[in-house]
Amino acid sequence: MILKRISILNYKNLEQVEIGFSAKLNCFFGQNGMGKTNLLDAVYFLSFCKSSGNPIDSQNIRHEQDFFVIQGFYEAEDGTPEEIYCGMKRRSKKQFKRNKKEYSRFSDHIGFLPLVMVSPADSELIAGGSDERRRFMDVVISQYDKEYLEALIRYNKALAQRNTLLKSEFPVEEELFLVWEEMMAQAGEIVFRKREAFIEEFIPIFQSFYSFISQDKEQVGLSYDSHARDASLLEVLKQSRERDKIMGFSLRGIHKDELNMLLGDFPIKKEGSQGQNKTYLVALKLAQFDFLKRTGQTVPLLLLDDIFDKLDASRVEQIVKLVAGDNFGQIFITDTNREHLDRILQKVGSDYKVFRVDQGVINEMGAEQ
């Protein structure tokens, strides 16, 4: 899928944007805070029905405005045009449409426009809690497996209901707990099996990308831990119930799964330098792209936001070789350093566009500039 053109009104600091894109490489340069990331976030919104950063939709409306609109005009591999519309008014329900037909459920759209975004916020995958790493798995698997997404939604709904019962000041019958625990167990087993299968297939792809970028300087790995691995999830929940009542929430279940990120045999969170951490995250996301490309029906979009920060020259050069090659589809890349972008352009050839971003205004630059 190729994003041919985007139209934006009042999204964050982008007052009015109308630009057409290259089918291969689109470069955006400008100082920090000018709107480069906001443009990528608008593209992300069209794939996931939400911002990559701020989940509160109304807070993404431009200051002193009452609404935002994002429209993307795409072209499928067979030439079929696709129009995606998102509109949000303050104190109103968000609208999401494909070819002017509104979705009844946002989850029906997930996976239609597969996308991978590499951004500075990815540092939370290493530094943050286990929920960040579970979200990474969820974002990947949900884009190619509808059964996974539906099971995850069912599990989270049942988890919320069980937690409500756990907080109750009055006695709750066991049968009522069992209703939600059985739903959690049934949906949770599906989520567990699909996460486990994904990680097993994903690890060698990830290791291959890391080895290329680092030029085999370090060994990395991933391991997946879950309460569902060694026992029936229903039994795990039942056995934990009395302790959960004391705590007021569910201590065990697939919502506590962990994806361990390793440098050698140790957690990269404790062992990794800034450059190693950044290499790890870039390799993780490029592997995500490669995995989705293999499993899906269409090549994902790739958004690279400030990707070269904290990397030494040799690792920057390896990433340039990767993204300039033929294995990636349409790419959107931002940087404050025009020289980084020019090095990529020299390797790509003629199919690219360069844009300057300044105070929310985006202008395409001529080839001679």
UniProtKB/Swiss-Prot annotation:
Role noted for this protein: The RecF protein is involved in DNA metabolism; it is required for DNA replication and normal SOS inducibility. RecF binds preferentially to single-stranded, linear DNA. It also seems to bind ATP.
Superkingdom in the source lineage: Bacteria
GO cellular component terms, A-Z: cytoplasm
KW Ubl conjugation (keyword) present: no
Gene of this entry: recF
Species assigned in the record: Bacteroides thetaiotaomicron (strain ATCC 29148 / DSM 2079 / JCM 5827 / CCUG 10774 / NCTC 10582 / VPI-5482 / E50)
Name of the protein in its database record: DNA replication and repair protein RecF
PROSITE patterns listed in its UniProt record: RECF_1, RECF_2
Ligand binding (ATP): G30, Q31, N32, G33, M34, G35, K36, T37
InterPro entries xrefs: DNA-binding_RecF, DNA-binding_RecF_CS, P-loop_NTPase, RecF/RecN/SMC_N, RecF_2
